[in-house]
């Protein structure tokens, strides 16, 4: 085990949760690591880390146990947690949807786990169309967050399906496509009547996506002083020069 094995610090952070021996191996790499906090452990689906926090009396929400199990698709562990009386809430379904774990979501719903619009939004964020389709077929609500997070992830097919099936959208769809540099998503959204505002240009500037900004402006997207101020703050000098040369407001 060497430090060369860990490009992502999150991978290193997972290992101490495995065993005492693994903690010692991590220490031998000479790398420093931070213990996973509750939110990060859930995001990573690291149930063992959440359980360790629980044993140490450091868990702020007992529901985090079910969320972590759902996020990583650990159905048997989720079943054990529920049999032991562990509470859950709508975030369990949302985390299962984000991870693309349809079987976990189906079991949770069959056992009366609540859900809300975040289940659809998280399925969209994860690019899990089958999960989104099942959720909608079974009555899960959705809102503009589904289109927003589909755009954020660059999941054009997901966005197209959502719109074809009546999902609402708003300016946040264009904003998230611009933020992440998904020009094809922005183009499709704009062509199909999605509203936009100066936030689209500002977030293109934030991400340093000059091609997105140029296309947005060529197609009538408004901008204001935030485009320049954000581009400067992020040190996107080519974008600053282009925006100034093309009349972006500074006041």
Give, region by region, the residue ranges found by the protein language model.
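Ankyrin repeat (ANK) tandem alpha-helical domains that serve as protein-protein interaction scaffolds
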Residues: 1-251
């Amino acid at each position: 085990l060497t430090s060369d094995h860990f490009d992502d610090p999150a991978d290193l952070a997972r290992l101490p949760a495995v065993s005492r021996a693994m903690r010692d191996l991590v220490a031998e790499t000479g790398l420093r690591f931070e213990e996973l906090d509750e939110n990060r452990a859930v995001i990573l689906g690291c149930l063992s880390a959440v359980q360790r926090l629980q044993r140490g009396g450091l868990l702020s929400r007992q529901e985090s146990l079910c969320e972590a199990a759902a996020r990583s698709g650990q159905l048997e562990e989720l079943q054990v947690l529920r049999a032991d009386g562990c509470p859950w809430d709508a975030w369990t379904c949302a985390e299962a949807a984000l991870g693309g774990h349809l079987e976990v979501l189906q079991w949770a719903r069959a056992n009366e786990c609540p859900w809300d619009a975040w289940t659809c939004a998280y399925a969209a964020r994860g690019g899990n169309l089958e999960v989104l389709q099942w959720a909608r077929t079974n009555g899960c609500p959705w809102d503009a967050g589904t289109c927003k997070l589909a755009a954020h992830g660059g999941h054009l097919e997901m966005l197209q399906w959502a719109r074809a099936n009546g999902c609402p959208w708003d300016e946040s769809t264009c904003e998230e496509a611009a933020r992440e540099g998904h020009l094809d998503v922005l183009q499709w959204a704009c062509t199909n009547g999605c509203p936009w505002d100066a936030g689209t240009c500002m977030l293109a500037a934030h991400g340093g996506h000059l091609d997105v900004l140029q296309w947005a402006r060529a197609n009538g997207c408004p901008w204001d002083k935030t485009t320049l101020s954000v581009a400067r703050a992020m040190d996107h000098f080519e974008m600053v020069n282009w925006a100034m040369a093309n009349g972006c407001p500074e006041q």
